[in-house]
Amino acid sequence: MSGLIHQSCLLFHARRSNLVAANSMRGMRGRPEMRAVVIGLALIASAASAQEQVAIVGGRVVTNAGAIVDGGTVLLNGGAVVAVNPAGAAVPAGFRQVDARGKWVTPGIIAGISQIGVAEVHGVDSANDTEADTSAASAALMLDGAFNPNETSIPISRADGVTSAVIAPKPGRTLYAGQGAIISLAEGQIAPTRARAFQYVAYGETGARLAGGSRPAAWIELTNGLEEAKRLQVGLMMPMRDQHRDLRITRDDAEALTLVLRGAHPLLVRVDRASDIRQILKLPSLYPGLRLVLVSANEGWMVANEIARAKVPVITLGMDNLPGSFEALGATMSNVGRMVAAGVTVALGTPDLDASFQPRLLPHYAGNLVAQAKLPGAVGLSWEQAFAAITRAPAEIFGLGSQGSLQGGAPADVVIWSGDPLELSTHAERVFIRGVEQPLETRQTKLARRYLPGQPAGELPVEYRR
């Protein structure tokens, strides 16, 4: 309920549509190929003109690729990091200098799992495209078709240093939820940067409920989908040949799962209980080439060595410390610290409903794991490990190359912070995505400017009227 109230407040003012682009295209009705060319050229020209040579000078630079550079200079050009130079290095001619003295400079935050951009209000079905309860399709569903770049939470998260996010569907009719996407939070980004990025599956209690009421039923449904995909790969799944077989998934679903079998898409499995994790860890040996990623894994610490041996990464919230269900009786805030200590790659995300539209809180979750390490008997993370969990680790899990770091050739997703980004009192002062400085205005800042006492009335819009 608190999440619904929060999101409803964000929608207090309706966003006005930008009609300029629509008006300019009216003369091209009936010529979709010309419209596509014009739109594409306009976007390229806009991005090229916005990118410039920038030197961020004098900050405490967290590279995620080596030691922290105090007083360093980060050079950006053409949407990429050119170099991170030491303190006192000369700034090349032609670079606009941005003063970061006394500030922290880091890679942008990457949300490991979220539902930002696809669920404006979770409690309203018409504003929530994360699940399809009655659709005949399941694994074939592609979440990118629901991405709304005008969603209220996107500029809010961008203003708090989040530059990219992994968005995941929720299971509806079956335990196969569908294909998630990866998005950039850049202003004007109208489509995901990677439309079909992974397959998302629910196991454990949720998977059991969707598959018929038990974990054995969930395992059969999970492996049946992969077996049908394997049959399709070798040409055995055909309409005439299979007309007398009891097919549990559609051909479209099977085609989507062939990408999982080939390793083109990671298979993200939401699972918590230690015994369920052991069961899911059997998948890579049953289907060689499958790239498995565990999501949530509240009891992962109990089988951390097995997860590490299997070289399977984990994406989790990291804040669960109460037995919220029978599959999470072993939940503890030492979970992430124990898994990382065992050698597991762990990224932080917001897979839970109340937090899924709030990836802006990830730095604070990471900071809590640093504090956890200071408690007697608890296991947490070092500062470097915690910050990597919200930057470099998700980039590694999803094959994003050098994103999540500041080094030559890395994407120029950079945030200048007022202080330590894992401290609660810190805020993002400037945000660059692919080398373009981003606006930090949000719905909240507009409302504050409109309604705070002492604002000059003549320069403000009228309040809402019925």
Short names for language-model regions:
Residues 59-62, 70-71, 408-451:
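C-terminal cap of metal-dependent C-N hydrolases
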Residues 61, 65-106:
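Histidine-rich, glycine-flanked metal-binding segment
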Residues 147, 153, 158-291, 427, ...:
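Polyanionic/metal-chelating signatures
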Residues 121, 128-134, 139-140, 266, ...:
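His/Asp/Glu-enriched, well-ordered alpha-helical/loop segment
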Residues 36-46:
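Bacterial N-terminal signal peptides
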Residues 48-52:
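Boundary at the C-terminal end of the N-terminal hydrophobic targeting segment
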